[in-house]
Amino acid sequence: MDVEKLWNHTKKDSIFQTTHFSSSSKPFFTRSFSTKTSSSPSSKSHFTRSFSTKPSSSSSSSDLIFRRSFSAKPKTSKSLLLSRSCSTKSSADLSSKSSSLSRILSKKGASVTGKCFKVAKEHKSRFYIIKRCVLMLVCWHKHS
């Protein structure tokens, strides 16, 4: 088999370099990958990547479509730290599940934060009491 017949390679813009791979035998999954770089050589480069895997049009519409995206961008132009996000989603009942899930997670996060705050406050008060007792004993020992 000839490699050129199996893989088609296309490039679009010079700023947006996009590569699409597809097989001539109609694969079940198609892939796309894009990279965006800044056009000025003096500024630091910013990369944005996206990757999606979907069933081809020959598959039935009842199949689930899975999407995955990844992005890496500096928070400021001078910062070297990268902010990343990655998610995998299914298209079935996504809107109702995601809203209830985010509410549940925010309630759990608030309750955990409240518990941690209470434990830290108790620990601080115990430490203060013990510190006062030790100081009192030291002073009592010196004066007796």
UniProtKB/Swiss-Prot annotation:
One of its GO terms (biological process) is shoot system development. Belongs to the DVL/RTFL small polypeptides family. Small polypeptide acting as a regulatory molecule which coordinates cellular responses required for differentiation, growth and development, probably by restricting polar cell proliferation in lateral organs and coordinating socket cell recruitment and differentiation at trichome sites. The gene is DVL15. It is a single-pass membrane protein. Glycans are attached at residue 8. This is Small polypeptide DEVIL 15. GO terms for cellular component: plasma membrane. Residues 111-142 are annotated as: Required for DVL/RTFL small polypeptide activity. It is found in: Cell membrane.
